[in-house]
UniProtKB/Swiss-Prot annotation:
Organism: Methanococcus maripaludis (strain DSM 14266 / JCM 13030 / NBRC 101832 / S2 / LL)
Keyword field: Ribonucleoprotein, Ribosomal protein
Family: Belongs to the eukaryotic ribosomal protein eL31 family.
UniProt xrefs under Pfam families: Ribosomal_L31e
Taxonomy, superkingdom: Archaea
GO molecular function: structural constituent of ribosome
One GO CC annotation: cytosolic large ribosomal subunit
InterPro entries referenced in this protein's UniProt entry, alphabetically: Ribosomal_eL31 (IPR000054), Ribosomal_eL31_CS (IPR020052), Ribosomal_eL31_dom_sf (IPR023621)
One GO process term, biological-process aspect: cytoplasmic translation
Annotated protein name in UniProt: Large ribosomal subunit protein eL31
Length: 83
C-alpha cells in the first residue's frame, strides 16, 4: 500500500544548536531522523532537490523550514521537495 504525505520540517533547532560549520550536514541528518520517526521506517531516501535546497546558501545559512512530499512504498520512504 502506498502512503503519501506532505510535511513541513522545522530546521530552526539545528540552526540554534549547531556551530556554523556543521549546520547543513546536521540539517540533512535532522530531516532524515524526522522522516524515520513520523513515517515509522528505517529506510529513508532523500531526493537531490532537498539536498540542493539545504546547501543553496552555503554551509551555514540553512533554511528555517523545508516542505517535503513523502511517499512510503513498503518499507522504503522517498522524500522530494515541494515547490
Amino acid at each position: 500500500m502506498e502512503e503519501e504525505r506532505i510535511y513541513t520540517i522545522p530546521l530552526r533547532d539545528v540552526t540554534n544548536k549547531s556551530p556554523t560549520t556543521k549546520r547543513a550536514p546536521r540539517a540533512i541528518r535532522a530531516i532524515r531522523e524526522f522522516l524515520k520517526k513520523h513515517m515509522k521506517s528505517d529506510i529513508v531516501k532523500l531526493d537531490n532537490t532537498i539536498n540542493e535546497k539545504v546547501w543553496e546558501r552555503s554551509l551555514n545559512k540553512i533554511p528555517a523550514k523545508v516542505r517535503v512530499k513523502v511517499v512510503k512504498e513498503g518499507d522504503v520512504v522517498k522524500a522530494t521537495l515541494v515547490e
